[in-house]
Amino acid sequence: MLLIPAIDLKDGHCVRLKQGDMDQSTIFSEDPAAMARKWVEAGARRLHLVDLNGAFAGKPQNHAAIKAILREVGDDIPVQLGGGIRDLDTIERYIDDGLRYVIIGTAAVKNPGFLKDACVAFGGHIIVGLDAKDGKVATDGWSKLTGHEVADLGKKFEDYGVESIIYTDIGRDGMLSGINIDATVKLAQALTIPVIASGGLSNMADIDQLCAVESEGVEGVICGRAIYSGDLDFAAAQARADELAGA
């Protein structure tokens, strides 16, 4: 089970939002590269970056901070990034910078042709982020609910050749209310590509539950507010996941 620390970037700082609200942000570090180093030293084997300004602006806004993180962690730690990725040139630039995976969210839902082109041009590097509330997909920084069912879109994108799906329950993100295990497993069972859980991770019990469903296709989990608030010790959680996996 991959435990993937999230580094959310706003105005060059590492922050956490409450339920995706840019006006409800807490700064956890003014040096995101140092934060990246901290998580790698604690045992992280992948990092999850979000360009929050980019997600709302529709184009990259924290490029300098992202490049600094990539320089800090080097080639050994895969880094995935979402937020403001709406064209092939942006993907190419990030991959040239050393990014392993780009996460396409809103653009995948609104412009599936772009996603298909991205999978052809950058096979193996494309992850789709599906954000949902009550099984319905949301777009535009969670501000718009669509009528699309998560599983239907997941299957469609799997056919395009995406690497994996990050599933976020936006009713729980940043609320420390526990992962929506049932919804995550339901999506994983509908697909053959891996699903990464996101939204609501709060304690070691969540880690135990996730490890129990890893065989269903749940590859990992994004670790956000809980590891910043101290509710979850990241190093202990990764050690627990490895122990349960017999690693």
From Swiss-Prot:
UniProt superkingdom: Bacteria
GO biological process, one term: L-histidine biosynthetic process
Cross-referenced SUPFAM superfamilies: Ribulose-phoshate binding barrel (SSF51366)
Enzyme class: isomerase
Keywords assigned by UniProt, alphabetized: Amino-acid biosynthesis, Cytoplasm, Histidine biosynthesis, Isomerase
Enzyme Commission code: 5.3.1.16
Catalytic activity field: 1-(5-phospho-beta-D-ribosyl)-5-[(5-phospho-beta-D-ribosylamino)methylideneamino]imidazole-4-carboxamide = 5-[(5-phospho-1-deoxy-D-ribulos-1-ylimino)methylamino]-1-(5-phospho-beta-D-ribosyl)imidazole-4-carboxamide
List of catalytic residues: 8, 131
One MF annotation (Gene Ontology) recorded for this entry: 1-(5-phosphoribosyl)-5-[(5-phosphoribosylamino)methylideneamino]imidazole-4-carboxamide isomerase activity
Annotated compartments: Cytoplasm
UniProt entry tagged with the keyword Cytoplasm: yes
Main location (coarse class): cytoplasm
Disulfide pairings: none
Family of the protein in this entry: Belongs to the HisA/HisF family.
Protein name: 1-(5-phosphoribosyl)-5-[(5-phosphoribosylamino)methylideneamino] imidazole-4-carboxamide isomerase
Organism: Variovorax paradoxus (strain S110)
